[in-house]
Regions:
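Conserved beta-strand hairpin/beta-sheet module of binuclear metal-dependent hydrolase folds
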Residues: 1-23, 104-121, 134, 143
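Active-site metal-binding loops of divalent metal-dependent hydrolases
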Residues: 7-9, 33, 56, 96-99, ...
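Active-site metal-binding motif and surrounding structural segment of the metallo-beta-lactamase
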Residues: 10-56
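Active-site environment of divalent metal-dependent phosphoester hydrolases
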Residues: 34-38, 58-61, 100-101, 125-127, ...
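Metal-dependent catalytic neighborhoods of phosphoester/phosphodiester hydrolases
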Residues: 39-48, 62-64, 198-206
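Metallo-beta-lactamase
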Residues: 55-113
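Conserved catalytic scaffold of divalent metal-dependent phosphoesterases
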Residues: 82, 88-98, 108-116, 122-124, ...
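Cap/insert and terminal regions of metallo-dependent hydrolase folds
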Residues: 130-221
Length: 231
């Protein structure tokens, strides 16, 4: 089974990664409506892959939806967002903190992978999680690098404020990881690292030292076994 995360890249790349086999795909989760996350949503829908996102995200991504198929709205209630059962995957959405209509993160569980945290485009992680085996987490920028670029006139101050209100800094990422029980975690994958405001190598080394875990930097073509056990 396979569960897709986001729909921001050309779907032909996803197809290639799947070896052309869409029969094992049980769905696609989208965190929010920005183009790098939802811009290719029609390509996914046109292959009849079920897409799931918040109502706010679906409305915000309307300009990208040009398909006879429509995404499925994840319902929100007094007790939080509804739990999804997609094949053998259980998905628990949670609210993210980003400059988007109704952004989400996801806790995903499967018998083979254990618990997976997927959190991107959020300046703060409002929840802690139990039973984590693998983590995909944003580590977007270093506040010192960001401030230095503003001081040097490389970027406007308004952009600095936007980044601070929308993305997870290295230090906040580290705090979020420390707030969770990482005992059974096999992999931490750092995602959405800014080219200009981040330092992926330094982030990886710092988080590996602080957590004692295997830490990866997300990049095209990266393959990692997300097993429940270390081997």
């Amino acid at each position: 089974e396979a569960l897709l995360l986001e729909a921001g890249k050309p779907f032909k790349h996803t197809l290639a990664a799947l070896g052309g086999n869409l029969r094992k795909v049980v769905g696609c989760l989208i965190t929010h409506e920005h183009g790098d996350h939802a811009g290719r949503i029609s390509e996914v829908l046109n292959y009849a892959v079920p897409v799931f996102a918040s109502q706010g995200t679906i409305e915000g991504a309307e300009k990208y939806i040009r398909s006879n198929y429509q995404p499925n709205a994840i319902r929100a209630g007094a007790g939080g967002y509804e739990r999804l059962n997609l094949g053998g995957f259980t998905v628990i959405p949670f609210p993210a903190k980003h400059d988007a209509a109704e952004p989400l993160g996801f806790y995903i569980w499967h018998e083979e992978t254990g618990g997976i945290l997927f959190a991107t485009d959020t300046y703060y992680l409002p929840c802690t999680f139990k039973g984590l085996s693998n983590i995909l987490i944003e580590c977007n920028y270093d506040p010192d690098i960001l401030a230095r670029r503003v001081a040097n006139g490389d970027i406007p101050e308004v952009l600095q404020e936007r980044v601070r209100r929308s993305h997870l800094s290295y230090y906040t990422c580290l705090d979020a990881l420390r707030a969770n029980d990482l005992t059974a975690v096999n992999n931490i994958v750092l995602i959405h690292i800014s080219d200009g405001n981040g330092d992926g190598v330094a982030f990886r080394e710092g988080i590996a030292k602080a957590t004692g875990k295997t830490v990866h930097i997300a990049k095209p073509g990266l393959k990692i076994k997300f097993n429940k056990t270390p081997f």
